[in-house]
Amino acid sequence: MIFVFGDSHAGKFGADKRFTLCGPPAPTAYGLANEKNKSESLFLLRQMLHEVEQNDIILFVLGEIDCRVHVFRQHVLTGKSYAEICAGIITRYGRILLAVRNDNNCEIAVLDVPPAVKQGNEYEYDFYGSRNERASIAEEFNSQLETFCKENGVCFVKLHPHISDEWGWLKEEYSVDDVHVSEEVVPIVVQELQKCFPNL
């Protein structure tokens, strides 16, 4: 069984019977480490873990909201570089990832962040990066997340290179709206997962 825990991008796996979905609305990679947050993501993760059995796989799908909204905002407010801010997020996110794997005798995999999307500042955030800025943030985040996964023996699922154009933006054929990837990405993710788990 593959449990998918994540944000709204995780919903694309629902049509495939190999996947079981779990996750709150709009969770972030940063917020997953908070005992108390609006999305109750850590609480819901712990609830899901009661259903996970030995040798099950948990696929984490988090970070898109961090990269689209929060990293740029913190960059403006604090003057810190994208790299510094991403490092802080991944430290927190990574701590939970390793705890889940080590404490529950299960396998974990981490999906990278999808490419920058068309959506502008429709929610009127006080600070919101351009599409190029958001593409740079996603690239930095994915680079650091991949390094973390390699250093800790975690399966890193690379979707971004398959569905991004030369500017690091989401290709039209993989977009279902101005924010989300389409179901067309699921076979790619399965193919990438099989590199880590050949019997999948």
Give the role of each language-model region.
Residues 118-158:
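Substrate-gating cap/lid alpha-helix
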Residues 2-92:
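Conserved SGNH/GDSL esterase-like catalytic core that processes O-acyl groups on lipids
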Residues 61, 111-112:
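Alpha/beta-hydrolase-fold catalytic nucleophile elbow
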Residues 112-114, 151-171:
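Acidic carboxylate-rich catalytic motifs and surrounding loops in phosphoryl-/glycosyl-chemistry enzymes
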Residues 68-82, 119-129, 170-174:
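Surface-exposed, active-site-proximal loop segments in enzymatic domains
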Residues 77, 81-88, 129-140, 177-181:
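Alpha-helix N-cap and loop-to-helix initiation/capping positions
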Residues 146, 155, 172-200:
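Histidine-centered active-site loop/cap adjacent to the catalytic His
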Residues 92-110, 140-157:
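A structural motif corresponding to the C-terminal end of an alpha-helix
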